[in-house]
Regions:
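N-terminal and secondary-structure boundary signal
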Residues: 2, 6, 17-152
Length: 152
């Protein structure tokens, strides 16, 4: 499974921290990717700069936005990137109610906001949930996820 989060390609990174104990080489400084203008072309350039092409069936997790809302990445901005990796936009229904609490309404919101015009949209918990083991987890031994995660 390979998932791409659009936030993972934006120009943010955490600084490298050295050990307070010393005694080892400092970790390599992280690469920082920066573009002055956030454009469809620059979204693709940032992705390509990672030099880690996505292979297999790829899921892009982003918010398709609440019905009538405006707090989501515009499809025109991400279309070229989403289509470059030939993938599917994925989300889960909301647990807090609202206009994306049911799969039917969620898909309508995705269509109304233009996401279904640029890529397939898969509501991960449309067919229920599945339980996946967490290997060597500190707090959890299993996680409940939308069943469609098994398709990726």
């Amino acid at each position: 499974m390979y998932m791409v989060s659009l936030l993972s390609i934006l120009p943010f990174t955490a600084p490298a921290c050295g050990s307070a104990q010393g005694g080892g080489e400092a970790p390599e400084a992280p690469k920082v990717y920066f573009v002055r203008d956030i454009t469809p072309e620059n979204m693709v350039r940032l992705y390509e700069a990672l030099e880690r092409p996505a292979t297999g069936k790829v899921a892009v997790k982003l918010s398709t936005g609440e019905p009538g809302g405006h707090n989501f990445l515009k499809p025109e901005l991400i279309k070229d990137l989403v289509q470059k990796v030939d993938d599917t936009i994925v989300e889960c229904n909301t647990a807090y109610g609202g206009g994306r609490a049911s799969t039917e309404n969620h898909l309508k919101a995705a269509a109304d906001h233009g996401f279904t015009a640029i890529a397939p949209v898969d509501i991960m918990d449309a067919d229920g949930v599945t339980t996946l083991p967490v290997k060597d987890g500190k707090w959890f031994t299993e996680m409940h996820m939308g069943k469609n995660i098994l398709n990726y």
